[in-house]
Regions:
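N-terminal beta1-alpha1-beta2 submodule of the flavodoxin-like/Rossmannoid cofactor-binding fold
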Residues: 1-97, 176-183
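Structural beta-sheet core signal
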Residues: 5, 72, 115-119, 154
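A short, flexible beta-alpha/helix-coil linker loop
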Residues: 9-11, 122-125, 159-163
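Active-site donor-binding loop signature of nucleotide-sugar glycosyltransferases
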Residues: 42, 120, 157-159
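Functional cleft and adjacent loop/helix regions within the main domain
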Residues: 55-66, 107, 133, 143, ...
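Short, structured loop/turn "capping" segments at alpha-beta junctions
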Residues: 95-99, 150-152
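Short, glycine-/small-residue-rich phosphate/pyrophosphate-handling segment
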Residues: 101-147
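Glycine-rich phosphate/pyrophosphate-binding loop and the adjoining helix
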Residues: 128-183
């Protein structure tokens, strides 16, 4: 069993999404008796934006397909995912490999893979929030993974930019959710 651990935050040790993905990976590894972990830090070693020349490099796709579980840290920057994460997604959403077009429309080809995504946001963007219309990270990630045949699981830490107290409260709550997800 292999875990692919994806981090996209540029905030290093101060990153809430990195703290959450580390906790998820640690708990899954412990529960599964030390699964192999492949860590791809998209902020430290970003993939170039997709070009025709870059399309031939299938290393990100190969890692994704080989993993049994994928854990993704997705901080929300300017209402969506970081460009580093988008560049990675561009390499795993491949016609004929992770999805196909058929008579009934697109069909996801990725089966039996668990994807856990930790989304961190500076404000509150839930459905009941006045800012809900500005949230494009969760909706994008859910749509992309559904498109390729995966039902992703999410944990959220919201309101991180409001105050230090709110940040601490949100992270504590998210870590409780992580324990439930990783079980």
């Amino acid at each position: 069993m292999t875990i692919l651990h994806i981090d996209a935050s540029i905030n290093g040790e101060n990153s809430a999404s990195r703290a959450l993905t580390k906790s998820i990976v640690d708990q899954i590894s412990k529960a599964q008796w030390g699964e192999a972990v492949i860590h791809r830090d998209l902020a430290a070693t970003p993939l170039p934006h997709l070009t025709l020349d870059q399309f031939a490099d299938t290393s990100a796709l190969d890692e994704f397909l080989a993993a049994d579980t994928v854990v993704i840290g997705a901080p929300m920057y300017n209402f969506t995912v970081p460009t580093q994460l988008k560049a990675w997604i561009d390499r795993i959403v491949i016609a004929g490999t992770t999805f196909s077009y058929g008579a009934n429309g697109p069909e996801g080809l990725v089966k039996g893979k668990r994807v856990l995504i930790a989304i961190t946001r500076g404000n509150f963007y839930g459905e009941d929030s006045p800012s809900a219309g500005f949230e494009f990270a969760y909706r994008y990630l859910k749509a992309v993974f559904n498109f390729i045949g995966v039902e992703p699981e999410f944990v959220f830490a919201d309101g991180l930019g409001i105050s230090p107290e709110q940040r601490e409260k949100a992270l504590e709550s998210a870590l409780v959710e992580v324990e439930l997800l990783a079980a």
